[in-house]
Amino acid sequence: MFGLIPASLAAASPLPALLAFSAAPLAHLRPLDIAVIAIYFGMVVWIGFYLKGKSNTSEEFFMAGREMTAWIAGLSFVSANMGSLELMGWAGSAYQYGILATHWYWVGAIPAMLFLGLVMMPFYYVCKTHSVPGYLDLRYGGHARSVAAFSFAIEMILMSGVNMFAMAVVMKVVLGWDITFSIFVSSIAVALYVGLGGLRSAIFNEVLQFVLIWGGALLVPILGLAQAGGVSGLKRQIMTNMQSMTGVSSDSYFHLWRDTSHFAANPMGVHWTGIVFGLGFVISFGYWTTDFLVVQRVLAAHNLRAARMAPIIGSFFKMAVPFIVILPGLLGLVLLQNADGSRRQLVGEDVVAACSLNSSGQVAEQGGCTAAMAKTNLSPASQQKVMAGGDDAELHSYNQALPLMMVRYLGPGLLGLGITALIAGFMSGMAGNVSAFSTVWTYDIYKPLINKNGSDSHYVMVGRMAIVVGVAVSIGAAYLVMHAHGIMDYVQALFSIFIAPLLAVILFGMFWKRATRLAGFLGLLLGIIFSAGLFMWVKLTPDALATVALSPDAKPMAENVFRALWAFIFASVLVVVISLLTKPRPVAELEGLVYGATKLPKEDPVPFYKNEYIWAVLVVIIFAALNILFW
């Protein structure tokens, strides 16, 4: 999911900037590579047709029949958050900020995933809701559900379009494919396999995507480390050349926590309080425990124990993802080279756009390019080369670190596998958002507000129609991204604005019997408005960032975590105050919805090696060890 978007992808004009490229594609596919990509497209469509017969009822179509094993649900759960947009973005962030980017995979995911599995999942699963807005309806009533449902629906369509356009742009840059061709091929494939097989088809394709991403990307860090001389060699080379690039001690690139006691002491410009409370609590818990795109995968598990185990299984793989994402970004700092053998230095998307080349290979706007490069750490020789134009004059962005490393290390067949992994990631992001949109539209908007008495087959038909409409609107969103350079910033804001108030409302609803219907509705609605107000304040008055993040040294990445923290606090205060001023529901009505008012079903005893708490403790031990190791 796109909720945890890297700053490099949410900057002023991330995706449209890539359209500025006019030079040759980064890679040329051999017949074997093309065959690998064609086989992938054939497989995903075949899966949709194969599973159509198992997706005839609403429970089968929208919830995969609740038949998924813990392993399938767990892999799908973590895979839903492994879209290529995220992988490329965080590899680029690692190039910029070093190992600090790993926080978004560890402290920004693991505690929340364990909390979902062990604490929250029993309530989601026992109440048999089809969606997170469905839980809000049961706990707070229809008004709260409607706010959540419409917010989710808009977010999912926009995110599907962003993934669609991002894939098309990457294919243009890497392979030279036409933008429109890529958009329509991907949209037709997604509409076919999700429309036919529903959530079951989306889940199985996400598991396929998980395998492809690891298979396509694993060789890059292995071969890169070998060339760099291992971890010690990588550190030594970064120490040699990073001081001149950033002005920050390159030693900071290898520490998670040591340099976070002050905003100015680390490359990311964040403080440990923002990492722990803003990212580690509000953003992380808000995404992993309330975002329907990922929660839907766990709700598809075949029983409560499987539903609890799924996020725990996913957390093991989540801790390993930095090896194929963060490490290639770090390796790119020392291994990427220009054609003349000099070190290739990546820059921001705004610089790429300002220094775009015309058809003759010359910089189109030399004045703007000069001004943009002056704000970077590009060497004078590199800047002169860009201004001179011609071969090897083209700049590449941070977000291209992973594709550039793939092109460097993957040969025929393997390059096709790597490109297929990127395509699979983008299409999985599209499919996940479209399938979630279909469920939310059908169960949380259409059924309660338009047609409450339809037959089961009618709602399946509505769900399939919603997928077609969702894909069509996503195509429009993709072209909107193409022409609206700042939309990625607003898409990220849409997500971060919504999750903090939603988390507050759900936590109070699940753990405090006194929380009332009006408190849930107003806490969510006014919390969203408050968070949006903070976003617009910083957008219109950049100096306000220092106030929101509590430091004049804060960088844009800090704004996201602190805005989420303030929005959570604001919504929490509202829920508490309004609940104390209004009448609560009778405790008898809260059965299955709130701790202290619910008797959870008894589960049969299992061997210790199948006990979810044992595995959760193991995750905590590994998580703690990793943070200490890279402190």
Residue ranges and their predicted role:
Residues F2-W631:
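Membrane-embedded helix-loop-helix hairpins and adjacent transmembrane boundary segments
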